C-alpha cells in the first residue's frame, strides 16, 4: 500500500495466502485472501473481485500482512526446507522421501483439529534429551543439519505443552 501512496488516487492490495508453483494448480476458492484499499470505493471493488475468487476473504492492514507473511514463511517455507533436509538424510541412506508422505499427511491432518503446539510430537516434545543427544551425535558429520536440529530441538524443549 505504501508503494502507491501519493502516486495514484485509488489503490489497493489483494493478497492470496498460498504457495504457488508452476507445476501445480490450486483451488483458489479455498485460499484465504486479504485485502486493503486506499478508500471505501476501492475496497468495495477489490472485495468484490476477491469474493469471486475465494470463499475466504477478509480485510487486513499492511502492517499485519507483514506478520502474516512471516508466519507463512515459518509454516510453509521453513517446513519445506526441513523436508529437503529429511530427503538429503534419506537419500544418503538409500531411502526414498516418499516414506515420509504418510507421516506428513497425518501431521497436516492433525493441524485441522489441533493447535500446532498440541500437535507437536517427537523426542524434544517428550523431553527425551537422550534421544536428541543420540540424533545430534549421528549428525556430527553435517554441521548444517546438526545446527538446525539443535536449534529446533532447543526451541521445542523450551516451549513444550
Task: Describe each region flagged by the PLM.
Residues 10, 25-70, 75-112:
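Internal alpha-helical scaffold of NAD(P)-dependent oxidoreductase catalytic cores
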Residues 14-20, 33, 75, 79, ...:
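Long, contiguous hydrophobic alpha-helical segments, chiefly transmembrane helices and signal peptides
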